[in-house]
């Protein structure tokens, strides 16, 4: 195990990381133990009672966080003709078809999210190996393959995030910056948990949300008592 830095040790001094906390306490302590000299991101890890190797238990979706992510989201839109003009009007940072694909093949990936109209998906598929591993591949299930490019762009710019469980059944997502404060982080977390709850596969048996832990970029992870999920969503 790597040696923990002095700032980290000081931050967690006297803190019991084995406890399962309320949502409010976990968020507050995560923010309070932030120690980096930059505005850290607050992240959540949610362990789900699903087996992603079965397609009917794959949990993936998208949610627009009410308080955003505290960063500028660069959006590339794969489209042609009138849709290209519409995309630029809606705030797309890049819009086009063949020229964008050619740039990506040459190694260009200076954007944070991508949208595509259905008619150019065959073209976009040519750069699937570049986009897929970085989570940039447009997907109909998350609303990023659509002719309604204006709405998709506005959602992404407003703080929409796409998520899916990994092979271990764990879902990771950002919730904003430490500077947001507890109230906004909790608001974003509530929207995410509500969405994840709605996406519970009918084939999933037993406990659905099995574990939760929140942390900042450099900070420790604080466990959340999953027995409090219902109370949190009703609050």
Swiss-Prot record:
<dbReference type="InterPro" id="IPR023673">
    <property type="entry name" value="Ribosomal_uL1_CS"/>
</dbReference>
<comment type="function">
    <text>Protein L1 is also a translational repressor protein, it controls the translation of the L11 operon by binding to its mRNA.</text>
</comment>
<keyword id="KW-0810">Translation regulation</keyword>
<dbReference type="InterPro" id="IPR005878">
    <property type="entry name" value="Ribosom_uL1_bac-type"/>
</dbReference>
<dbReference type="GO" id="GO:0006417">
    <property type="term" value="P:regulation of translation"/>
</dbReference>
<keyword id="KW-0689">Ribosomal protein</keyword>
<dbReference type="GO" id="GO:0003735">
    <property type="term" value="F:structural constituent of ribosome"/>
</dbReference>
<keyword id="KW-0687">Ribonucleoprotein</keyword>
<dbReference type="GO" id="GO:0019843">
    <property type="term" value="F:rRNA binding"/>
</dbReference>
<dbReference type="InterPro" id="IPR023674">
    <property type="entry name" value="Ribosomal_uL1-like"/>
</dbReference>
<dbReference type="InterPro" id="IPR002143">
    <property type="entry name" value="Ribosomal_uL1"/>
</dbReference>
<keyword id="KW-0678">Repressor</keyword>
<dbReference type="GO" id="GO:0000049">
    <property type="term" value="F:tRNA binding"/>
</dbReference>
<dbReference type="GO" id="GO:0006412">
    <property type="term" value="P:translation"/>
</dbReference>
<protein>
    <recommendedName>
        <fullName>Large ribosomal subunit protein uL1</fullName>
    </recommendedName>
</protein>
<keyword id="KW-0699">rRNA-binding</keyword>
<keyword id="KW-0694">RNA-binding</keyword>
<comment type="similarity">
    <text>Belongs to the universal ribosomal protein uL1 family.</text>
</comment>
<dbReference type="Pfam" id="PF00687">
    <property type="entry name" value="Ribosomal_L1"/>
</dbReference>
<comment type="function">
    <text>Binds directly to 23S rRNA. The L1 stalk is quite mobile in the ribosome, and is involved in E site tRNA release.</text>
</comment>
<dbReference type="GO" id="GO:0015934">
    <property type="term" value="C:large ribosomal subunit"/>
</dbReference>
<keyword id="KW-0820">tRNA-binding</keyword>
<dbReference type="InterPro" id="IPR028364">
    <property type="entry name" value="Ribosomal_uL1/biogenesis"/>
</dbReference>
<dbReference type="InterPro" id="IPR016095">
    <property type="entry name" value="Ribosomal_uL1_3-a/b-sand"/>
</dbReference>
<comment type="subunit">
    <text>Part of the 50S ribosomal subunit.</text>
</comment>
């Amino acid at each position: 195990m790597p040696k923990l830095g002095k700032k980290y040790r000081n931050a967690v001094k006297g803190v019991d990381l084995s406890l399962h906390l309320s949502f409010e306490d976990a968020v507050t302590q995560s923010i309070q133990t932030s120690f980096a000299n930059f505005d850290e991101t607050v992240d959540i890890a949610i362990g789900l009672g699903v087996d992603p190797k079965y397609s009917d238990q794959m949990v993936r979706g998208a949610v627009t966080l009410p308080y955003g992510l505290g960063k500028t989201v660069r959006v590339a839109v794969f489209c042609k003709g009138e849709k290209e003009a519409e995309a630029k009007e809606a705030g797309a940072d890049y819009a086009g078809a063949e020229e964008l694909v050619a740039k990506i093949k040459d190694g260009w990936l200076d954007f944070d999210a991508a949208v595509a109209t259905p008619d150019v998906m065959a073209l976009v598929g040519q750069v699937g190996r570049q986009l897929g591993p970085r989570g940039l591949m447009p997907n109909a299930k998350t609303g990023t393959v659509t002719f309604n490019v204006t709405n998709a762009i506005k959602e992404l710019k407003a703080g929409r995030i796409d998520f899916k469980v990994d092979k271990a059944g764990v879902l990771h997502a950002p919730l904003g910056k430490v500077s947001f404060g507890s109230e906004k982080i909790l608001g974003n977390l509530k929207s995410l948990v509500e969405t994840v709850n709605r996406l519970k596969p009918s084939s999933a048996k037993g406990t659905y949300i099995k574990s939760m832990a929140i942390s900042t970029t450099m900070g420790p992870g604080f466990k959340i008592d999953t027995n409090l999920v219902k109370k949190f969503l009703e609050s």
